[in-house]
Amino acid sequence: MEKTMSNSTSTPAAHRLGLVGRKVGMTRIFTEEGESIPVTVLDVSNNRVTQIKSLEADGYAAVQVAYGTRRASRVAQPQTGHYAKAGTEAGSILKEFRLDPARLAEFTPGAVIAVESVFEAGQQVDVTGTTIGKGFAGTIKRHHFGSQRASHGNSRSHRVPGSIGQAQDPGRIFPGKRMSGHLGDVTRTVQNLDVVRVDAERGLLLVKGAVPGHAGGDVVVRPAIKAPAKKGA
């Protein structure tokens, strides 16, 4: 029978346990007052501990967790031994979360971390994902430049950025100049999203608003590190 770990102890924001999962998609839920709230559904089920890292052995304290599944034929031999040592099946994602060394005794390799033991409704979280790749894009789409005139002397220069530098002096384009290029497919974190609902039975987390990436993309959910202090606290 699988064991469930708890995250009840208060720790600094930088050393709080998070969960790994995937973005299911967006929907909306209604409050008792009839208010419609747009939410993103995150599947953070079956996060299992694969390794405990200690100060003595590794130089820092952390818990390594795995999420998802992977066919045995797709797992490298060293990873196969790593998962076998933890007594758990191979995952598609491995992620470490730094913790207070005093908390390492709470975790056991092979144990499953329940979503309700880490997050609760009303809490704020930071969600990290990979944005949707949009390929090569011009400056209007990539940097929100304004277009040039549609006519009146403008010929074939309607969407070009204009001047990108000077003449012989300095004779180069300065670093950081906003130009056309690849758009999207980068790691981004959205901070301070409200947890609207926690579905413990299915291992789902419903957060208010949008999350980076497409449906099915990998995400990392952590307690908000910049959560505003409560009034009167």
Swiss-Prot record:
The modification N5-methylglutamine is found at Q168. The keyword Ribosomal protein applies. It holds the Pfam family Ribosomal_L3. Keywords: Methylation, Ribonucleoprotein, Ribosomal protein, RNA-binding, rRNA-binding. Belongs to the universal ribosomal protein uL3 family. It comes from the Bacteria. GO terms for molecular function: rRNA binding; structural constituent of ribosome. Methylated by PrmB. InterPro entries: Ribosomal_uL3, Ribosomal_uL3_bac/org-type, Ribosomal_uL3_CS, Transl_B-barrel_sf. HAMAP family: Ribosomal_uL3_B. The keyword Ribonucleoprotein applies. GO terms for cellular component: cytosolic large ribosomal subunit. This is Large ribosomal subunit protein uL3. Residues 145-172 are annotated as: Disordered. PROSITE patterns: RIBOSOMAL_L3. GO terms for biological process: translation. Part of the 50S ribosomal subunit. Forms a cluster with proteins L14 and L19. One of the primary rRNA binding proteins, it binds directly near the 3'-end of the 23S rRNA, where it nucleates assembly of the 50S subunit. SUPFAM superfamilies: Translation proteins.
